[in-house]
From Swiss-Prot:
Cofactor details (free text): Binds 1 zinc ion per subunit.
Principal location: cytoplasm
HAMAP family: AcetylCoA_CT_beta
Organism: Yersinia pestis
InterPro entries registered for this protein in UniProt: AcCoA_carboxyl_beta, Acetyl_CoA_COase_Trfase_b_su, ClpP/crotonase-like_dom_sf, COA_CT_N, Znf-ACC
Swiss-Prot/TrEMBL keywords: ATP-binding, Cytoplasm, Fatty acid biosynthesis, Fatty acid metabolism, Lipid biosynthesis, Lipid metabolism, Metal-binding, Nucleotide-binding, Transferase, Zinc, Zinc-finger
Cellular localisation: Cytoplasm
NCBIfam families assigned to the protein according to its UniProt record, in alphabetical order: accD (TIGR00515)
Protein name, UniProt field: Acetyl-coenzyme A carboxylase carboxyl transferase subunit beta
Reactions that this protein is recorded to catalyse: N(6)-carboxybiotinyl-L-lysyl-[protein] + acetyl-CoA = N(6)-biotinyl-L-lysyl-[protein] + malonyl-CoA
Length: 304
């Protein structure tokens, strides 16, 4: 028997169980590295309260943030992707679809809904970047066109939140065709004189930026969002030159006149309501309690 065992009475020694912390309770800001409480970050609309970095947000969370509670009606939810080409790279396309559906709970990379924004009828769509990089494929194009058709039927504006890496390579020409398909649908909105507001979030690239994302009557971007066709790393390798600081970011684009506004996420809903009321010649909506009223303000920053 060791000396410590002789000193301590075994009957008085109690076993302690190591407390375990469930996964997903904490997360880290991609920009400042600050450790953040997950529930608090969700209440803050995925905006870091320390540095104001706008993290990626799910499609449904964006639409619920925008539309009045209880007014949301989903459009095109019955549409599902199909592996028409039997495509396979390092993995079968159908397996990639199944994995993405399991991870996100979505059938494809775009969610569309109709509802009201402070009482104004609107149709809204949002890309789900977690679903295969928000890539545009047949179902994405079909749902977007369904959203346009609903806006035409209801004679109301359309708002789209873009967050995509571009066209989905696994559907080849079928995905590239969606660029023309969505652009043609938006031309009908223009003919009817109905507003289309495009909100560009991080990242908006490739075929999406070359079609529906940049065709808004007003193009709004979130702060520091990456927006372009090819990525900066690809461009640098092609031209063999160093790109200027902030190239393809929202602040760079607005300086060059490529976009119209940069709006922080906490004030996005009220800003869209104000713009749409002017474009549709409706009374200016009163400032009501917003879904973002509890959003923390970053240090030394004001709303844009």
């Amino acid at each position: 028997m060791s000396w410590i065992e002789r000193i301590l009475n075994k009957s008085n020694i109690t076993q302690t169980r190591k407390a375990s912390i469930p996964e997903g309770v904490w997360t880290k800001c991609d920009s400042c590295g600050q450790v953040l409480y997950r529930a608090e970050l969700e209440r803050n609309l995925e905006v870091c309260p320390k540095c104001d970095h706008h993290m990626r947000m799910s499609a449904r969370a964006r639409l619920h943030m925008l539309l009045d509670a209880g007014s949301e009606v989903e459009l095109g939810s019955e549409l599902e992707p199909k592996d028409i080409l039997k495509f396979r790279d390092s993995k079968k396309y159908k397996d990639r679809i199944s994995a993405a559906q399991k991870d996100t709970g979505e059938k494809d990379a775009l969610v569309a809904m109709k509802g009201t924004l402070q009482g104004m009828p609107i149709v809204a769509a949002s890309f789900e970047f977690a679903f295969m990089g928000g890539s545009m494929a047949s179902v994405v194009g079909a749902r977007f066109v369904r959203a346009v058709e609903q806006a035409l039927e209801d004679n109301c504006p359309l708002v789209c939140f873009s967050s995509s890496g571009g066209a989905r390579m696994q559907e080849a020409l079928m995905s590239l065709m969606q660029m023309a398909k969505t652009s043609a649908a938006l031309a009908k909105m223009q003919e009817r004189g109905l507003p289309y507001i495009s909100v560009l979030t991080d990242p908006t690239m490739g075929g999406v930026s070359a079609s529906l994302a940049m065709l808004g009557d007003i193009n709004i971007a979130e702060p520091k969002a990456l927006i372009g066709f090819a990525g900066p790393r690809v461009i640098e390798q092609t031209v063999r030159e160093k790109l200027p600081p902030g190239f393809q970011r929202s602040e760079f684009l607005i300086e060059k006149g490529a976009i119209d506004m940069i709006v922080r996420r906490p004030v996005m809903r009220q800003t869209l309501a104000s713009i749409l009321s002017k474009l549709t010649h409706q009374p200016q909506p009163s400032v009501v309690e917003s879904k973002a009223d509890t959003v923390a303000q970053p240090e030394n920053q004001a709303d844009v």
